[in-house]
Amino acid sequence: MDMDLNNRLTEDETLEQAYDIFLELAADNLDPADVLLFNLQFEERGGAELFDPAEDWLEHVDFDLNPDFFAEVVIGLADSEDGEINDVFARILLCREKDHKLCHIIWRE
């Protein structure tokens, strides 16, 4: 995969893209009660956080997860408005290079 550092999604674009994907696929991949809980609580406690890809992604994909080009977005709920997300609904691995659309999701079970 040939990737260009000057053709990457910004951090905000990456978060927005991951959240859009989450919203589109959540109803098909989460328990209906979880979808309802997330929708009711997101305004007050919800969030999406951007990280370098965690090591355990290597159990799911077979390519190099260079943090210059790949990001993990965690979507879920926190105990408070400024708290860390501790109730994870999805972990989304995205390629930030605009010409390489790639997404893997680990859903809450």
UniProtKB/Swiss-Prot annotation:
NCBIfam families xref list: PRK05094.1 (NF003469)
The protein's name in its UniProt record: Putative double-stranded DNA mimic protein YciU
InterPro entries: dsDNA_mimic_put, Put_dsDNA_mimic_sf
Domain of life: Bacteria
Function: May act as a double-stranded DNA (dsDNA) mimic. Probably regulates the activity of a dsDNA-binding protein.
Family the entry assigns: Belongs to the putative dsDNA mimic protein family.
